[in-house]
């Protein structure tokens, strides 16, 4: 091999790699399929940085969902690989998985521009700060890390476990826009996560918005969404009356008095007062307006 300045040409190119052009443009995040893919990757993918310009985006899911990774591969016009593997876990023997890996620096930089952190990210993820397709983004996140189905009692639900406060705020605002209802959710004491559960008619409204005809989605979750769309409330199932809205005076009283005093004065349950106080304090800590 011919040498130049004491090193081989191969070594020179390794030390001075050509910059990788972006596979996609930042503005393409507004496209439904791209927003969906980004939401899915944010929920279940892992962005790793190595030395220099090395690194990769990797996402591993059950082999039965290989279809969705093939769709992602077709959306990203740069080299990537899809590989299958079989391993035993604490829960399943001979678990079959499929992984999609992209090393292209331009694509990895684009994911960072959109807001995807490297390494552990569950507690800091949030919706993109630039224009994106909201419905498709949250469908991607739910397909990647949520559940869609029926309870043992036959009630439809859409469930999503969230760690990040920023992502929770965005998702609750999205749910309010779809269902017309404001939700207050507290972290579970055991796992320190938010479990956002949408059920019954609200679940029907949500899947109608999320899983629209022709959208990119996991086929099995699209099938479940179709089943939820057909659900009707049993005649003998009572409809829970709407809760009383919180006024500015109520909010001020809760912040200035004890839980028991607030329960008696406002005529509300312990859980209602406790959740409201937690939400108000978090809004104040984040610089929000109460």
Predicted features, each with a name:
Residues 1-290:
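Internal intein/HINT superfamily modules and their associated LAGLIDADG
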